[in-house]
């Protein structure tokens, strides 16, 4: 099981939440943590996770999850409601960059994702979630590449694929309906021709009989 699947199962599923995406990060400025109970300073992995509740009305949140060295479990650390997110800074709109900043009402973090592509995927999901679930005040996305905001995102591509499939299916049904319609018209014409032939034959038979 991947780390993200394990986080979804351990952290969010028990609370009836659904994890939409996650990105593994490190602070751009190294920040020490307090000594652990064992007396030593712990190394850890950090994940920024985006989730929504399964119950209506849907609430979205961003959660910081950590996994300490030597442990197989994950720990929920900080959490913010999506409404508290004020700004998402992609740092450089002209190139793939793993760096980004998140500004909340009461917190500001500077991160480096494990890869630029992982950051890009998380940003696409985050932007889509903000557009879908936030109606009033949406966070500002600055210094982000156009593929995050525009039609090249994986979410838009998936939507386009579904739309294309529906359009193709609809077109196929329309063409089939047209073929059936033409067949029905042809059958009706043949029926009328047969009736006319029968009437003509009947008239000829009556004429010769007379």
Swiss-Prot record:
Alphabetical list of CDD domains matching this protein: PH-STXBP6, R-SNARE_STXBP6
GO cellular component: cytoplasm; membrane
Protein's cellular compartments: Cytoplasm; Membrane
Keywords from the named record: Acetylation, Coiled coil, Cytoplasm, Membrane
Modified sites of kind N-acetylserine: 2
Record domain v-SNARE coiled-coil homology: where: 151-210
InterPro entries named in the record: Sec3-PIP2_bind (IPR028258), STXBP6_PH (IPR037821), STXBP6_SNARE (IPR037822), V_SNARE_CC (IPR042855)
Coiled coil: none
The keyword Protein biosynthesis belongs to this UniProt entry's keyword annotation: no
One Pfam family from the record: Sec3-PIP2_bind
GO BP: regulation of SNARE complex assembly; SNARE complex assembly
Bilayer topology: Peripheral membrane protein
Main location per the UniProt record: cytoplasm
Oligomer and partners: Part of a ternary complex containing SNAP25 and STX1A that can be dissociated by NAPA and NSF. Interacts with STX4A.
Biological function: Forms non-fusogenic complexes with SNAP25 and STX1A and may thereby modulate the formation of functional SNARE complexes and exocytosis.
Record's protein name: Syntaxin-binding protein 6
Naturally occurring in which organism (per UniProt): Mus musculus (Mouse)
């Amino acid at each position: 099981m991947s780390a993200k699947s394990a986080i979804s199962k351990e952290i969010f599923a028990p609370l009836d939440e659904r994890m939409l995406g996650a990105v593994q990060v490190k602070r751009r400025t190294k920040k020490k943590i307090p000594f652990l109970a064992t007396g030593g300073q712990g190394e850890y992995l950090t994940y920024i996770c985006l989730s929504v509740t399964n119950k209506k009305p849907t609430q979205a949140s961003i959660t910081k999850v950590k996994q300490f060295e030597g442990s197989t479990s994950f720990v929920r650390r900080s959490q913010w409601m999506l409404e508290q997110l004020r700004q998402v800074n992609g740092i450089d709109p002209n190139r793939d960059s793993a760096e980004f900043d998140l500004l909340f009402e009461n917190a500001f973090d500077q991160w480096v994702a494990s890869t630029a592509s992982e950051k890009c995927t998380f940003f696409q999901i985050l932007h889509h979630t903000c557009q879908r679930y936030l109606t009033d005040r949406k966070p500002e996305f600055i210094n982000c590449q156009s593929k995050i905001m525009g039609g090249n995102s994986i979410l838009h591509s998936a939507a386009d694929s579904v739309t294309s499939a529906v359009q193709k299916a609809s077109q196929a049904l329309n063409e089939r309906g047209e073929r059936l319609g033409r067949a029905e018209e042809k059958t009706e014409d043949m029926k009328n021709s047969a009736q006319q032939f029968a009437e003509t034959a009947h008239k000829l038979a009556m004429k010769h009989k007379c």
